[in-house]
Regions:
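PRPP-associated nucleotide enzymes
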Residues: 1-179
Length: 179
């Protein structure tokens, strides 16, 4: 089991990259089946989902598009609950099937805000595809039909997720070690 130190925190390996990729493939297969007769628009939420989105999109075999949006609700190790749009979407989504690609759904505030913003663009449908979901920490009611993994309410880094902007490049997912 690997241990990494990022700034003032210590993390241990909790989900190896090989396990992540196997589970991403399962979700990609479902998306390929469900969108076989559609051309979905995948909206990757930056910065955290960039590695997940890249791996997922290489597994998607149906015609599709990808765009990027950026929201922020994290500072340090806890979700602030505050919301601001940093980089929006300029693409016309009218009548399109939208799949939001997110790294982690924690409190759900960011995702609920994004869904409300996207509904104003009149898409045919909106689905959520999240690498990780913390069901025990959800504060809002969300339908997450494409969850790769559910995890406990631990703080994690790696595979795109960060601690104060560091650790995104780690290939595995690491859980904080309580000191």
């Amino acid at each position: 089991m690997g241990i990494v130190k990022i700034k003032d925190k210590t993390f241990k390996t909790s989900i190896p990259e090989a396990d992540i990729l196997k589970k991403v493939q399962v979700v990609a297969d479902r998306l390929n089946q469900d969108y076989a007769d559609k051309t979905p628009v995948f909206l990757a939420v930056l910065n955290g989902s960039f590695i997940f989105a890249a791996d997922l999109m290489r597994m998607i075999t149906v015609p599709s598009e990808i765009s990027f949006v950026k929201y922020a609700s994290y500072e340090g190790t806890s979700s602030s609950g505050s919301m601001k749009t940093l980089m929006g979407l300029n693409q016309d989504l009218t009548g399109r099937h939208v799949v939001i690609v997110e790294d982690i759904v924690d409190s759900g505030f960011t995702m609920a805000h994004m869904i409300e913003d996207l509904k104003k663009k009149n898409p045919a449908s909106i689905e959520v595809c999240s690498l990780l979901v913390k069901p025990g920490n959800l504060k809002v009611d969300l339908d997450i039909n494409y969850a790769v993994m559910e995890i406990p309410n631990d703080f994690i880094v790696g595979y795109g997720l960060d601690y104060d902007q560091e650790g995104r490049n780690l290939r595995d997912i690491y859980t904080i070690v309580e000191e």
